[in-house]
Amino acid sequence: MSGHDSGNAKRGRASFGAFVRKPVERDVVASAGEAAEQGSLEAVQAWPDDAVEVGAVVDAYGLKGWIKVATHADAGRGGDALLDARRWWLERGGERLSARILQSKTHGDTVVAHAAGVSDRDAALALRGFRVFVRREDFPALAADEFYWVDLIGLEVVNEQSVALGTVSGMIDNGVHSIMRVEYPAVGKDGQPTTDERLIPFVGVYVKTVDQAARRIVVDWEADYS
């Protein structure tokens, strides 16, 4: 179970967020009707509640206003969502923009895209440094036994004896499979309350059920395991 995760091991590295899956090599092109309504970049005050950061604008691509986005992992985590979403949300400092995406495609380990209102290289270069978000609802659908990392954060973890082990605080990938970072309350050497962490491999031999509706993960893991 990987960062998008299933019972099969996936490659990729990521420190947080969405999923690990190599973006499908494809072009996504706006229809004639969409192109007729290109519009422009829009400054926004309201921000989607389900916005998930999936990359950052790192450069211009070519001379016609395309931008290059580094996704949040070597394996392209965020790439499929970037290709599927027809609107991106951009943030740099206190500035927030909404961008209608007319075309997008993979380019090596990056995603390149043409946003409405960005017509030349200078305009594309002006977007360098913007973090790129897409709405969670725009993520591609997964198989029944696959999960996006962002959906696992905050879930309670219990073992098969119903002993509470903590809460998922993050996910890491060791290159073979994903690992849950599970935080739980503890007592420090000074006798003061603190937070400790256990690492549980996110693979089928240990992870028995993931119930997103109940916000609970059941694992085969003893409370005294490190």
From Swiss-Prot:
GO biological process, alphabetically ordered: ribosomal small subunit biogenesis; rRNA processing
Predominant cellular place of this UniProt entry's protein: cytoplasm
InterPro entries attached to this UniProt entry: PRC_barrel-like_sf, PRC_RimM, RimM, RimM_N, RimM_N_sf, Transl_B-barrel_sf
Keywords, in A-Z order: Chaperone, Cytoplasm, Ribosome biogenesis, rRNA processing
UniProt-listed PANTHER family: RIBOSOME MATURATION FACTOR RIMM
The protein's assembly and partners: Binds ribosomal protein uS19.
Name of this protein: Ribosome maturation factor RimM
UniProt source species: Burkholderia ambifaria (strain ATCC BAA-244 / DSM 16087 / CCUG 44356 / LMG 19182 / AMMD)
